[in-house]
Curated annotation (Swiss-Prot):
Quaternary context: Homodimer.
PANTHER family, alphabetized: CHAPERONE PROTEIN DNAJ (PTHR43096:SF48), DNAJ HOMOLOG 1, MITOCHONDRIAL-RELATED (PTHR43096)
Domains (record comment): The J domain is necessary and sufficient to stimulate DnaK ATPase activity. Zinc center 1 plays an important role in the autonomous, DnaK-independent chaperone activity of DnaJ. Zinc center 2 is essential for interaction with DnaK and for DnaJ activity.
Official protein name in the record: Chaperone protein DnaJ
Binding site for Zn(2+) 2: C165, C168, C187, C190
InterPro entries: DnaJ, DnaJ_C, DnaJ_domain, DnaJ_domain_CS, HSP40/DnaJ_pept-bd, HSP_DnaJ_Cys-rich_dom, HSP_DnaJ_Cys-rich_dom_sf, J_dom_sf
Pfam family, one: DnaJ
MF terms in GO: ATP binding; heat shock protein binding; unfolded protein binding; zinc ion binding
Zinc finger (CR-type): 135-213
Organism: Legionella pneumophila (strain Lens)
Keyword vocabulary terms for this entry: Chaperone, Cytoplasm, DNA replication, Metal-binding, Repeat, Stress response, Zinc, Zinc-finger
């Protein structure tokens, strides 16, 4: 199946800035999130495509590879790497060697071997709506590879240091001449590291990192929503042999609330009112995330009427603006009536039926429609 262009998926231009890409992702992820489109498989598939596109375009190295080679540059199944030639077996090294010579000015000496960057990690944190509204600082324990404190990440025994590999002169790769081709291969002596550790650290066994459980305090800003991520630079996996550490992404999810439903920064709720309050009007108390407020109900209010309370919703995670609280009133039908109450209601019903103009506009319109329906029917 043909893959869609990642820039097209995020609805941005190819020269879009990182901020524009992030803004587009947040908008589209919010629109197609499965929680907001229950049972909609097309929305779920769109959400997955948007996530994949953002994962590529938000990473500078992956974005550069995608800009140069398209999907083949970032999808291993289409070629096995940025060059897109991994699927050709042994010829992958041949073409890699050609590109190496082109982009290095024909020096033919390869790249200086350097440490490998640590992997990025993701940690999921679940918050209540109340916590998301005001922000929260949480302590998390992240299992990861951390830098070995004994050798300080070098992998060598304390007091010693790794030596440059004599076979590849620290390049991590060697060239082998086969006919007309000069093939570049991983150095068999240092296995691509460029250095030899003759006396490895006993604590990390020469890896420069060890398993640990790191406690980290995370400040989660007010206004976060499902799918938002907090990035902690350098708190991911430690790099190998001096490589930089990866990043930690704290993924936010919100617990379902008993009263409120969130739609972007607005909150929605249903408020039950009595038949008498709906007919005669009155005041009721409604809950907000900041406490109780009084809502005035005008006379002759119909069930389903929505009242908007300004700035009683969620704060914007960007630090400006606040959503509203939308209260939908539901007129309750009384139950478990006494004989006296039933008699009073019967009297009220008789009184209303004999009076004109007491039906709501919706009811009057419905009765008029039913009357016309029967008049037009031919039995």
């Amino acid at each position: 199946m043909e893959q869609r262009d990642y820039y097209e998926l995020l609805e941005v231009s190819r020269n879009a800035s990182d901020a524009e890409i992030k803004k587009a992702y947040r908008r589209l992820a919010m629109k197609y999130h499965p929680d907001r489109n229950p049972g909609d498989t097309s929305a779920e598939e769109k959400f997955k495509e948007i996530q994949k596109a953002y994962n590529i375009l938000s990473d500078k190295q992956k974005r550069a590879a995608y800009d140069q080679f398209g999907h083949a540059g970032v999808d291993p199944s289409m070629g096995g790497g940025p060059g897109g030639f991994g699927g050709f077996g042994g010829f992958g090294d041949v073409f890699e060697d050609i590109f190496e010579n082109i982009f290095s000015g024909g020096r033919g000496q390869g790249r200086q071997s350097r440490g490998q960057r640590g992997a990025d990690l993701q940690f999921n944190v679940q918050l209540t709506l109340e916590e998301a509204a005001i922000g929260k600082e949480v302590e998390i324990t992240v299992p990861r590879h951390g830098t070995c404190t004994v050798c300080e990440g070098s992998g060598a025994k304390k007091g010693t240091s790794p030596k440059t590999c004599e076979t590849c002169q620290g390049m991590g790769q060697v060239r082998i001449q086969q006919g007309f081709f000069s093939i570049q291969q991983t150095c068999p002596t240092c296995h691509g590291e460029g250095k030899i550790i003759s006396d490895p650290c006993a604590s990390c066994h020469g890896q420069g990192r060890v398993r640990e459980s790191k406690k980290i305090n995370v400040k989660i800003p007010a206004g976060v929503d499902n799918g938002d991520r907090v990035r902690l630079s350098g708190e991911g996996e430690a790099g190998v042999h001096g490589g930089g550490s990866g990043d930690l992404y704290v993924q936010i999810s919100l617990k379902k609330h008993a009263i409120f439903e969130r739609h972007e920064n607005d909150l929605h709720c249903e408020v039950p009112i009595s038949f008498a309050t709906a007919a005669l009007g009155g005041s009721i108390e409604v809950p907000t995330l900041e406490g109780r407020v009084t809502l005035k109900i005008p006379a002759e209010t119909q069930t389903g009427k929505v009242f908007r309370l300004r700035s009683k919703g969620m704060k914007s995670v960007r630090g400006y603006g606040q959503g509203d609280l939308l209260c939908k009133v539901v007129v309750e039908t009384p139950v478990n009536l006494s004989r006296e109450q039933k008699e009073l209601l019967n009297k009220l019903q008789d009184s209303l039926e004999n009076a004109k103009g007491t039906h709501s506009p919706k009811t009057s319109s419905w009765f008029a429609g039913v009357k016309k329906f029967f008049e037009d029917m031919k039995f």
